[in-house]
């Protein structure tokens, strides 16, 4: 099956698995997905992840995080899509739930959170928002 938006596919897999209280979820590997997962790990939205296998069957196992029985990731929203890219400059970077969530951007300085982008004074493609 061909996936037209691999990033959205990963985010939805993580969201669905956490809503069903699964301990892990597997997603096909890509460098961009790994960078996004690094941010989610650093910000405390997932417990950990590991890259498993060799190309072409390489995948990432994501270990989900819960507070009691409540998933840490409440929702995710894919903003920039393959058919409709969404770019923001440094002044337009949104604050997710008044700072309780994060926005992930792809900038000229790499993939980073909204806070890091504001600190560096760069804008870019708004990939997704997580809360």
Swiss-Prot record:
KW Lipid metabolism (keyword) present: no
UniProt superkingdom: Bacteria
Gene Ontology molecular function, alphabetical: rRNA binding; structural constituent of ribosome
Biological process (GO), any one: translation
Subunit structure as annotated in this protein's UniProt entry: Part of the 30S ribosomal subunit. Contacts proteins S5 and S12.
Family: Belongs to the universal ribosomal protein uS8 family.
The protein's name: Small ribosomal subunit protein uS8
